[in-house]
Amino acid sequence: MIRRILVTGTDGQVVGSLLEKAATRTDIELLPIGRPELDLAATDKIAPAIEALRPDVILSVAAYTAVDAAESDEATALAVNGTAVGEIGKAAARLGVPVVHLSTDYVFSGDKPSPYVESDPTGPLSAYGRTKLAGELALATATANHAILRTAWVYSPFGKNFVKTMLRLGETRDSLGVVADQIGNPTSALDIADGLLKVAGNLIASGDPALRGIFHMTGDGETSWAGFAAEIFRLSAALGGKSVTVDPIPTSAYPTPAKRPGNSRLDCGKIERLHGVRLPNWQGSTERVVRRLVAG
């Protein structure tokens, strides 16, 4: 049986990755929907747009992701990241289908010295983090049949991301200062797409309540932004790109409107145990993405 999978959004890193993955499969039909048919800022139009497509599962991946801009436009970010997610949940409940929602490490303060587990207290430092947390709560209120997947440090061959920014800056510079006192788990959107589809399939196939709730899903392994950048340039140089030196700098040397968590590491043991999902090591996935970008 072909499963109809509704995806919120029609572009961006995760949607691009989902479209690529779905193109190789015959058991799913991906239904990406975005503006004007689905405008997450227009609350009253969300449910009719979703219900008209009658999906078997909903992947809620579209979001307001401009972290710094959200500091001066939290109302818009809240409408998209918070209120709209609740409306998606209500529509799913009426249809009797599960929702898999993508969230973020930004719901945490980053003060914990070890990787965060799902039950750790939240404490977002930024407007973006607050609105994403609001979306988690709104979805949980709207429907019990959901899985919230928190991820971090997303990159891919698509959209705007750290890997593409580093490669672009490296074209005209011999050295770059990159923050070294923030640590996390770089995560390829291509791997996220695999995880989303696996969890969606599990929720369709089983009504086991243990498969619902909050899960952490990131690339395996950890590094700093400076370490991530150094690996990107090492890989690029090995493929014929120019050599770029990474100079580690503190967060204080690169001020931004939104505060970032110092520790973005997420413990992914729960999703591996219950859903059988373990994303690949970040270095291997980074090599695959860099190779595509450099070759392209």
Where are these regions (language model features)?
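Amphipathic terminal alpha-helices
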Residues: 280-296
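Active-site "gating" loop of Rossmann-like NAD(P)-dependent oxidoreductase/epimerase domains
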Residues: 67, 72, 105-125
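N-terminal Rossmann NAD(P)H-binding glycine-rich loop of SDR-like oxidoreductase domains
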Residues: 2-23
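NAD(P)H-binding glycine-rich loop region in Rossmannoid oxidoreductase-like domains
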Residues: 43-82
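NAD(P)-cofactor binding segment of oxidoreductase domains
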Residues: 72-100
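NAD(P)-dependent short-chain dehydrogenase/reductase
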Residues: 137-186, 190-198
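Mid/C-terminal beta-alpha module of Rossmann-like enzyme folds, strongest
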Residues: 13, 17, 195-196, 202-256
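Active-site helix of classical SDR
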Residues: 131
